[in-house]
Amino acid sequence: MAAKIRRDDEVIVLTGKDKGKRGKVKNVLSASKVIVEGINLVKKHQKPVPALNQPGGIVEKEAAIQVSNIALFNAATGKADRVGFRFEDGKKVRFFKSNSETIK
């Protein structure tokens, strides 16, 4: 099955502490988890690694977020939107369900 949310898609958070925030998908970990730029930031205590010249300390980084807690952002409507699939010229493409616009 094709993925409804892919890398570099602009998404909006539907639930949780970052509700309403928008960001770009950096990485799709599995069918159910993604990493979004600037969303779900957590503090990680990191040990120094002298061999790699990395300092230790508390580092803020993005954690994975469930796909069910985000939705694709439709720039035409300015809202979160659902995604569907259809065939155009023999290829399977994604489209927004609210206005039937094809997602590039």
Swiss-Prot record:
It holds the Pfam family ribosomal_L24. CDD domains: KOW_RPL26 (cd06089). InterPro entries: KOW (IPR005824), Rib_uL2_dom2 (IPR014722), Ribosomal_uL24 (IPR003256), Ribosomal_uL24_CS (IPR005825), Ribosomal_uL24_KOW (IPR041988), Translation_prot_SH3-like_sf (IPR008991). Keywords: Ribonucleoprotein, Ribosomal protein, RNA-binding, rRNA-binding. One of its GO terms (molecular function) is rRNA binding. Belongs to the universal ribosomal protein uL24 family. Part of the 50S ribosomal subunit. One of two assembly initiator proteins, it binds directly to the 5'-end of the 23S rRNA, where it nucleates assembly of the 50S subunit. This is Large ribosomal subunit protein uL24.
